[in-house]
Design a protein with these regions (language model features):
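Short solvent-exposed coil/turn linkers within tandem alpha-helical repeat scaffolds
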Residues: 22-28, 59-65, 94-104
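Alpha-helical segment of the N-proximal tetratricopeptide repeat
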Residues: 1-25
């Protein structure tokens, strides 16, 4: 996480990816995968960020990070100019995780467009 905070996003991607590969069953693996996607987003590699967040959702469907991953996917889709898909992703987030903090943010975004 220090690498991410310092702006060394490529280093953070390598570190977090390595952790997930080495310790895929760790309780910290979903968070590490989440940060891979965040670092890719910070590098403006939006397609890779979407893929990484989808990987989190697929590998760790019961993780509390899933709602945040969906919010990040929608953000990346919007950055790519795919606003219709971003809105669908935000709605999916609200439908699946209505009580989450991420759903609150999704509702705000849906209301502002």
């Amino acid at each position: 996480l220090d690498q991410f905070k310092r702006g060394d996003y490529q280093g953070a991607i390598g570190g977090f990816s390595g952790f997930v590969k080495t310790y895929p069953k760790s309780l910290l693996a979903p968070s590490a995968q989440y940060w891979v996607g965040n670092a890719q987003y910070a590098r403006r590699d939006y397609r890779a960020a979407i893929a990484s967040q989808r990987q989190l959702i697929q590998a760790y469907p019961d993780s509390p990070k899933v709602s945040d991953a969906l919010l990040n996917i929608a953000s990346a889709q919007a950055e790519l100019g795919d606003n219709a898909t971003a809105r669908r992703t935000l709605q999916e987030l609200v439908d699946k995780f209505p009580q989450s903090e991420a759903a609150g943010k999704a509702r705000q975004r849906l209301g502002s467009r």
